[in-house]
Amino acid sequence: VVGDTPSLYPSYIDTVSSLEIPIYRAIGNHDMTYGGRTFEYSYRTFESYFGPIYYSLNKGNAHYIVLDNCFYVNRDYQYIGYIDERTFQWLEKDLSYVPKDKLVFVVMHIPSSLQKKLRYNTLDQDETVNTAALYKLLEGYNAHIISGHTHFNVNVCFNDSLMEHNTAAVCGTWWRADINVDGTPRGYGVYEVDGNQVKWLYKSA
């Protein structure tokens, strides 16, 4: 949201309030507070401004789920892609109220899975290590995972009912250039939902 500068949260809130449209946020690695002794400390500031780090809502025939999969591991700026048990228990209960004919979106910062050639490092920071449990809970739904974190665009079809859309960071190559590492221009993803049908596109900015 503000690139490792939580003191800017009030200014950010003032700015987006003028848009007069609902804004839903998913916490990312640059939104955490580092230096504490536990994972729970890492999201307290974000949560105090924006509410729970995982939640869900319904719009039309779609059910939207926002998760936190940035797990702080008690070292300065060290985290892994991981969904904790508390979140899984909540998600399991949440989905128990969602009919199978509902379109489901799962929004989280770190991708659920990446091809090996697309990973930046071997620290499990670029994909979610326990993602198989998430896929299991989504079985039977027409589900789309929307993730960020990387600086490239890729769509992955896991099977006939599960797809992931990984959208490049709006900063491109870390604000050094107006392109992402895959050569696409800086921009954002747009998803159009009509009943159970989803169309998506990428818009340069």
Please describe what each predicted stretch is.
Residues 189-205:
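A short C-terminal boundary segment appended to hydrolase-like catalytic domains
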